[in-house]
Every structure is written in C-alpha cells, then in structure tokens.
Amino acid sequence: ADEYLSGNVREKLRVAELAAASDPAFAVNTEYLKKAQPKDLDASEIDVRLGATWVNRDYIQQFMEETFEPPFYLRRNIEVKFSPMTAEWQITGKSTPSRNDVHAYMTYGTSRANAYRILEDTLNLRDIRIYDTVEDADGKQKRVLNKKETTLAQQKQQAIKDAFQNWVWKDPYRRAELVEKYNELFNSTRPREYDGSHIRFGGMNPEIRLREHQQNAIALSLIHISEP
C-alpha cells in the first residue's frame, strides 16, 4: 500500500477511476488515491518564467501582441514558434516593425535591438548582448561587446520580463489553465511513506515503546533488506 500510494498518484488515480468504471472492486483504490493527492498549488505559489517550455505557444503570442501592440497588418508576419525537438523559441518577422514603432524600439526595445529580438533571446534564456564590428591592428574584423548598448538592451529585457509577470495571471481562464497544467506536470508525485505501526517485536521489553518515526525507520530497513 505504501508503494502504491506514492509516485505519480495523479496518473494512478486516473487509471483507477477508469478501472472502477468497469469493475466496482477498484472503487476502494480510487478512495485511497484521492486521499493521497498532493495539495494543489495556487497561482501565488507558482513562478512562471518567460521561456518555460510548458507554457503554450499561443499564450506567448498573445502576450507579445497585447504588450508590443504590433500593427494589425504585421501580426501574421510576426509569429512565435517553438520547436519541441530543440526546445528552442523563434520569432519570425521580428525585423519587420517600422523604426517609428514606439513599443518595439523605445518602450521594450532599443535602436540596436527591438522588442521582438529581445523577447526571442529572453524566451531562449539568453541575456541580450549588443556587439559592434571593428577592425583590429591587422585589418581583420572582430566583434566587440558594446557595454553601453548592452546595458540599455538588458534594461528593456527586464521590462519585458516584468510585463510578463504582470500579465500572465490577469486573465481568469488563462490562470486556471496554467495552474492546472503546472500541478499536473510538476506537482503529481507523492514520496513513499513507510508505516511501521504493524510491526510486532517478539521478545522485546514491553516497557519499551518505540516512537512512530522509529517504527517507520525499521519498516524502511526491512523493505531494503528484502529487496534484491
């Protein structure tokens, strides 16, 4: 029972409920598993990082459009894509916004890196960096970090992260879906507990009473001894 009521208990409950639907004998399994379910975390206990691969691509697209407000005629060109094979995010058409786009080049971007390029780096968990191409003493070109422009771009990157944190939980439907998905993916496991209350110790002084944690520790030891 200890082993059955541990591990991915959400998945075990689904299996038990399917079994109970055709065989009432499994109803007792569902009752025990329901009691073993981890307490659901709520939104205030969940940290959703911009770039988390479990967040639906459509939500990132929605965030981008609502925050950067690209012109409607550009929205089909500027698209968030995610590759499950490489776990990499891409924003197509990120260079299409006009230089007059305030959100793209001032509020959330700079003249050297617009908001869409910065968002793409953020989704891929990269700090935005701005480089200049210069010639060295031998006339060869090399890239040199532009510290001033990099600092400015990273300030915009932080502004995008902050905007996402303010946005992600605002919509009740989105909040409910993300909370459910997070709990399903990352809060479904229950560690195994070892119950030693059933163990009887023959020949032991009846005046000696083992505490609960001592009995459980003995149960754990006995299980390990019995395992090959």
Model-based region annotation:
Residues 178-181, 192-200:
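Short coil/turn segments at secondary-structure boundaries
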Residues 223-228:
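Conserved small/polar residues in nucleotide/adenosyl-binding loops
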Residues 199-212:
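Dynamic helix-loop-helix/coil hinge segments at AAA+ ATPase domain boundaries and subdomain interfaces
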Residues 1-188:
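Charged, low-complexity intrinsically disordered regions
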Residues 215-222:
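Pre-Walker A adenine-sensing motif
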